[in-house]
C-alpha cells in the first residue's frame, strides 16, 4: 500500500507541470490581444502606455519559444532597458525601461514609440510564424 501511494504521488509530480503550461487557448488569446493592442494604439501616448502589456505577453510566451527567438527578443529588450541595482542586488522587477524616464521629452517619445512598434512586430511574428 505504501509503495502504491508513493508511486501515485511521484506520478502526480511528473504530470502537474505539464498541466500548468502555456496552452493553445492562452496562445490564441495572446495573439488576439497583440493584434488588438497594435490596432488600437494609434497615437504616441497609447503606444507608450501599451508597451508594458506587450512585455507581459512576451514573458508569458517566453517558456514556449525556441532559444533563437528568445535570444533575439531578449537582446532587443535588453538594449532598451537598464538594470537598477541597489548594493549589487536588482530591485524587485530587476529592470526598468530606459524609455520611461525619457518620455517627458518629445525627442525621446520617438524612441519609445519605435520600441513599441518593433517589439509589437517581433512578438506578432512569433504568432504568425
Curated annotation (Swiss-Prot):
Residues glycosylated per entry: 49
GO cellular component term, pick one: extracellular space
Pfam family, one: Turandot
GO biological process, one term: response to mechanical stimulus
Keyword Membrane applies: no
InterPro entries for the chain: Turandot
Subcellular location: Secreted
Assigned keywords, A-Z: Antibiotic, Antimicrobial, Glycoprotein, Immunity, Innate immunity, Secreted, Signal
Leader sequence segment: 1-21
Keyword presence, Glycoprotein: yes
Function, as annotated: A humoral factor that plays a role in stress tolerance; gives increased resistance to the lethal effects of bacterial challenge and stress. Regulated by the JAK/STAT pathway and NF-KB-like Relish pathway in the fat body, upd3 in the hemocytes and Mekk1 in response to septic injury and consequent immune response.
Record-stated family: Belongs to the Turandot family.
The name this protein goes by in its record: Protein Turandot A2
Gene name in the database record: TotA2
Amino acid at each position: 500500500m505504501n509503495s502504491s501511494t508513493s508511486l501515485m504521488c511521484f506520478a502526480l509530480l511528473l504530470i502537474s507541470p505539464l498541466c500548468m503550461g502555456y496552452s493553445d487557448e492562452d496562445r490564441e488569446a495572446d495573439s488576439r490581444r497583440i493584434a488588438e493592442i497594435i490596432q488600437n494604439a494609434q497615437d504616441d501616448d497609447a503606444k507608450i502606455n501599451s508597451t508594458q502589456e506587450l512585455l507581459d505577453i512576451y514573458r508569458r510566451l517566453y517558456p514556449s519559444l525556441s532559444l533563437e527567438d528568445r535570444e533575439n527578443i531578449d537582446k532587443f529588450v535588453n538594449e532598451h532597458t537598464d538594470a537598477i541595482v541597489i548594493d549589487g542586488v536588482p530591485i524587485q522587477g530587476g529592470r526598468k525601461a530606459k524609455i520611461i524616464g525619457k518620455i517627458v521629452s518629445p525627442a525621446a517619445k520617438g524612441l519609445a514609440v519605435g520600441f513599441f512598434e518593433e517589439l509589437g512586430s517581433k512578438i506578432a511574428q512569433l504568432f504568425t510564424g
